[in-house]
């Protein structure tokens, strides 16, 4: 069993518990009653290379990354430093995240929020919207094509934006076939957890100009953002590099500054 398969098994078990507590019909009603989602596309289309800053306690590859006692305060620092979107992990077993973290961040910041989890069910999409999500992660490697297309349609029908994550050219083709408007290219192989920063440069040039391209994993500082920008990145998603830094707010500021610097390659959108 791969790491991804193991994570998804746990996600399904935890999902079953939540569904037994709050039935699907009720979570759908809550999602319909939630305030309208924020415009993620407008945020990511702003000039320069954007930063999606992540609240991340743990990872399967590194274990404990940071003791984040106040996720809302961390998110507020990210937003104040210029992050365009805040990503919040809600997977609990491997990443130490929770919907409680998400709720705390939502109550604190006005920036668009990405629910970062392993979405395998329409229930989770409505759950994300009910908790105030504006963007939802869909991982191509975790989904059959029919499920990917159905979940993407569900996300967009609720007014949210899908970040469709790929790691190979074949997965990118599947994402495009499903109608993805924002594609995240993850340098990390979710089956083996190995990181290859060259993956972005191999896949991004083959994507249509109108598709927003997000570089995921492997961003340790401004030079990595610049490198990804040179390969066509419209934005970078950064978690570990921020939460393990001495000053996460300063780290975001440095990335945002790099993304708007005249020397930074311009996104070709």
Swiss-Prot record:
SUPFAM superfamilies: Ribulose-phoshate binding barrel (SSF51366). It comes from Saccharopolyspora erythraea (strain ATCC 11635 / DSM 40517 / JCM 4748 / NBRC 13426 / NCIMB 8594 / NRRL 2338). It catalyses: 1-(2-carboxyphenylamino)-1-deoxy-D-ribulose 5-phosphate + H(+) = (1S,2R)-1-C-(indol-3-yl)glycerol 3-phosphate + CO2 + H2O. This is Indole-3-glycerol phosphate synthase. Belongs to the TrpC family. InterPro entries: Aldolase_TIM, Indole-3-glycerol_P_synth, Indole-3-glycerol_P_synth_dom, Indole-3-GlycerolPSynthase_CS, RibuloseP-bd_barrel. The keyword Acetylation does not apply. Its EC number is 4.1.1.48.
């Amino acid at each position: 069993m791969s790491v991804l398969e193991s994570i998804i098994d746990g996600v399904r078990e935890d999902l079953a518990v939540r569904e037994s507590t709050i039935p699907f019909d009720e979570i759908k009603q809550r999602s319909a009653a939630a305030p309208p989602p924020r415009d993620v596309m407008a945020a990511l289309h702003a000039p320069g290379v954007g930063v999606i800053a992540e609240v991340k306690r743990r990872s399967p590859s590194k274990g404990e990354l940071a003791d984040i006692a106040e996720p809302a305060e961390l998110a507020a620092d990210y937003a104040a430093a210029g992050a365009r979107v805040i990503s919040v992990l809600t997977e609990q077993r491997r990443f130490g995240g929770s919907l409680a973290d998400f709720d705390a961040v939502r109550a604190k910041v006005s920036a668009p929020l990405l629910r970062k989890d392993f979405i395998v069910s329409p229930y989770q999409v409505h759950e994300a919207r009910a908790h105030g999500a504006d963007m939802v992660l869909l991982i191509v490697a975790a989904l059959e094509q029919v499920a990917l297309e159905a979940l993407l349609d569900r996300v967009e029908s609720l007014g949210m934006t899908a970040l469709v994550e790929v790691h190979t050219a074949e997965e990118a083709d599947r994402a495009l076939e499903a109608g993805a408007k924002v594609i995240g290219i993850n340098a990390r192989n979710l089956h083996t957890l190995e990181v290859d920063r060259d993956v972005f440069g191999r896949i991004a040039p083959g994507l249509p100009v109108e598709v927003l391209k997000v570089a995921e994993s492997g961003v340790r500082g401004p030079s990595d953002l610049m490198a990804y920008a040179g390969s066509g990145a419209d934005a970078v998603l950064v978690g570990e590099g921020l939460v393990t830094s001495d000053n996460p707010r300063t780290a975001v500021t440095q990335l945002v500054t790099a993304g708007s610097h005249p020397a930074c390659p311009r996104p070709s959108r």
